[in-house]
Amino acid sequence: IIVWSLGNEAGYGPNFEKAYDWIKSYDQSRPVQYEQARHDGKTDIFCPMYMGYEDCEKYAQTDNPRPLIQCEYAHAMGNSIGGFKEYWDIIRKYPKYQGGYIWDFVDQGLRDKSKITGREIFTYGGDYGRYPASDNNFNCNGIIAPDRRLNPHAYEVRYYYQNVNRRSEERRVGKECRS
C-alpha cells in the first residue's frame, strides 16, 4: 500500500472526514486521497478528474503543498488518449504535478464465442440480454485488452512513460546538465 484511497464519485461529508481521521490515526506513514475533498477537504493529494492542461499548470504553480495526481485522466475510450503528450509536458515541468490514473487501464470484457461467426470475441453488458446491445465501448475502453494484449494507444502511453529524467552537474565546468 502506497496511498490510502477513500474512493471517488461518492459525495463528501462527515463520514469521509471521519474515515480520513481514522486512517491518519491508524497509519501516518502514507497519504490519504479522496477526489471529492477537492481543495479544502480532508485529502493529502489534490486528485481531481479530467482537469484541463491550463488548470493543471495553474495549480502546479500555486503554493498549495498538496501534490496533484489526477484520479482519472486521459480517457482511453476507443483508440483515443489524445492530449497525453501535453499532460506529460506539464508533469515533467512541475514536480508538484505527479501524474494520474488512466481511465480505463484494462478493458472489462468477457471472452465468449460469437453466436453468428463462432469466432472468439469480447462481450459485456447488453450482449447478454439485460439491456439493448450496444456498439459503444463503455466497458472495453482501456489501453490493455481483456486478453492483456496492448491496444494501439498503449504504445503512446509507453512512449511517454519510457523516459528516465535526471539532472546532474558537470564537475569540470560547474554547469547544470539536463537530459
Predicted regions and their residues:
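Short "domain-exit" segments at the C-terminal end of structured domains
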Residues: 174-179
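Extended substrate-binding grooves/exosites of carbohydrate-active enzymes
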Residues: 1-168, 172
